[in-house]
């Protein structure tokens, strides 16, 4: 018998793997499941991006190992994008590191800087990787509750001194997954000040900065003067450019964090396929605000369809200004797990139970906007029929 390493025994199976198995079991029985649990765009990238990949992959010299640091073209494209979008100036060589999707970067950064027994400050609810990365590194997680009455922002002013003395990383994520909440520059100023005072590495996961609604424009933590002295920001082309399957992300900011992350990554992977790096650079150069606004308008329409249905069935929701989700408080008498399982089993609609994201999510479900609009309409009709019809 082979036993798992103790580090792996500290963490549960990735929650979406478990949910996907439930869905597959239903599909195997012929159930038409509408998957509103997956946080990925359903729309394609810009056509020039696909054409760039098709053209570049024909070259005979692009199939070698790509190098560990990323191509100069891609690093400059990321730096230029941050300058255009946020007014932030970054050194492409020392402050920009392309990633095989930001998820691996979140893990590798944690492994690079967290020792056994160190504390990692993690929002609750949150993207599960922040928590599991800390546990795999031997760290301890200190949860920062995200409460609706506090706009789903963590209370940074009342973290116990003893916790801060032992903490190494502070994770933030705005626009937020799963709540759809947003943060202001004033909030980021407080976070940067806290990181500076307690020698924390502030890690801001920001893949949804270009997925926003109702005129809201999301900031970068790196816009705060001096933030790059204490902060690293993770971004991705997955949500902003509809390229989730391409696996292109980036870490930007603090030079020590970038160097440590590179040292870890270079011992684990061998970089991003060169044609994908070239196409990603094209995406960063060619993306236009009009394209983003049109895409986000489609998401906003889906959001509103979901909000209308949730209101009709008596489910409490907040109108998200960013990210790809509606965070819905489930009806009385249900936990989030129970409600999600009931809707999946009875209506064939898959929501993500809020408990996947932490104990503060136990009374919520996360509903994704990354589903074609006609399927959103059908899913909401099924949910209305199930609940209002009393089935």
Named regions from a protein language model:
Residues 333, 342-352, 357-391:
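PLP-dependent enzyme catalytic core of the Aspartate aminotransferase-like
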Residues 142, 146-215:
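Active-site phosphate-binding strand-loop segment of PLP-dependent enzymes
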Residues 29, 137, 197-198, 313, ...:
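Helix C-cap/helix->beta junction micro-motif
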Residues 2-101, 108, 286-287, 387-391:
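N-terminal small-domain helix-loop-helix segment of the aminotransferase-like
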């Amino acid at each position: 018998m082979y036993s798992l390493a103790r580090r792996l025994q500290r963490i549960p199976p990735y929650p979406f793997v478990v949910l996907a198995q439930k869905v597959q079991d239903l599909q195997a029985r012929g159930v038409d499941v509408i998957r509103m649990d997956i946080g990925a765009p359903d729309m394609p990238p810009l056509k020039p991006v696909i054409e760039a990949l098709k053209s570049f992959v024909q070259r005979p010299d692009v199939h070698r190992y790509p190098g560990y640091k990323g191509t100069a073209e891609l690093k400059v494209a990321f730096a230029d994008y941050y300058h255009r979008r946020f007014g932030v100036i970054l050194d492409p060589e020392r402050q920009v590191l392309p990633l095989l999707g930001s998820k691996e970067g979140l893990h590798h950064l944690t492994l690079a800087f967290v020792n056994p027994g160190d504390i990692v400050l993690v929002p609750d609810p949150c993207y599960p990787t922040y928590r599991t990365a800390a546990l795999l590194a031997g760290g301890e997680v200190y949860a920062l509750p995200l409460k609706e009455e506090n706009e789903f922002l963590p209370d940074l002013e009342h973290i116990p001194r003893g916790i801060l003395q032992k903490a190494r990383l502070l994770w933030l994520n705005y626009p937020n997954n799963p709540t759809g909440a947003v943060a202001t520059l004033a909030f980021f100023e407080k976070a940067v000040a806290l990181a500076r005072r307690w020698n924390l590495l502030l890690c801001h996961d920001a893949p949804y900065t270009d997925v926003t609604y109702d005129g809201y424009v999301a900031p970068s933590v790196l816009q705060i003067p001096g933030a790059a002295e204490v902060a690293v920001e993770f971004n991705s082309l997955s949500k902003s450019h509809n390229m989730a399957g391409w696996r292109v992300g980036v870490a930007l900011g603090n030079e020590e964090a970038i160097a440590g992350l590179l040292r870890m990554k270079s011992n684990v992977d061998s970089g991003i396929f060169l044609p994908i790096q070239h196409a990603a650079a094209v995406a960063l150069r060619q993306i236009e605000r009009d394209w983003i606004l049109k895409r986000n308008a489609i998401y906003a329409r889906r959001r509103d369809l979901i909000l209308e249905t949730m209101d009709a069935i008596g489910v409490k929701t907040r109108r998200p200004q960013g990210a790809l989700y509606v965070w819905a408080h489930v009806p009385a008498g249900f936990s989030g797990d129970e409600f999600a399982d009931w809707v999946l089993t009875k209506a064939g609609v898959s929501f993500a139970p809020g408990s996947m994201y932490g104990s503060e999510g136990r009374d919520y479900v996360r509903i994704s906007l990354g589903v074609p609009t006609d399927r959103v309409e059908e899913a909401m009709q099924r949910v209305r029929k199930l609940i209002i019809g009393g089935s």
